Amino acid sequence: MFSSKRYLNSFGWEEGNALKEGGLTKPILTSRKYNTHGLGAKHDIADQWWDNVFSAQLQSIQVNTDNGKVAVQSNGVSTKLRMAKYHSKYSALSSVFRYAGRLCGTFEEDLVDKSLDSSVSPVSSKKVKVRKTSGKESSKREKSKKKKEKKEKKDKLKKKSKRLKLDDSHTQKRKRKVRDKESKKSSKSGLKKVSGTKKVKA
């Protein structure tokens, strides 16, 4: 079995002194579990502060058997209760959260008049977002939409005409090539050899 004392002694450690300046004077010992209690069970009962607070509050209640009435005697806040509040207030878990103001929406809501809300049945009494627009704004929107549509139509027509022109130019080039080839073939076939190198049309 591994002995930490023997290991440290091999480096020149003496009991009661640190191996280096400012170091530990005793070896670190690991805790071992030899009992049959569940995981997380602690030896110190004082850590169960909620149970202690509950029992302290139960002791402050007095029941009279003569009248059958229950009387609560308050002797001020017990030290255990104060400690419990302190622990719950400054626990590690609750210190993680940040408390801030309420988050608000990023846009404003215009609601329907309250006179309309009174005539509506209670089932459908939800607040409704209504955006009020003036006549000028709506006409501006319509004009801008019409302008966009006209522009899109013009762009489409331009693209289409360009495509047709390109197609026409390509077809005309092809037709010219075909005509040239045909004319060359016909000119070759129509010529006959006459006395050596001269060619005469027949």
Curated annotation (Swiss-Prot):
It comes from the Eukaryota. It is found in: Nucleus, Nucleolus. One of its GO terms (biological process) is ribosome biogenesis. InterPro entries: PINX1 (IPR050656). One of its GO terms (molecular function) is RNA binding. The keyword Nucleus applies. The keyword Electron transport does not apply. Residues 118-202 are annotated as: Disordered. One of its GO terms (cellular component) is nucleolus. Keywords: Nucleus, Phosphoprotein. Its main location: nucleus. The modification Phosphoserine is found at S121. Residues 142-163, 186-202 have a biased composition (Basic residues). This is Uncharacterized protein C1952.02.
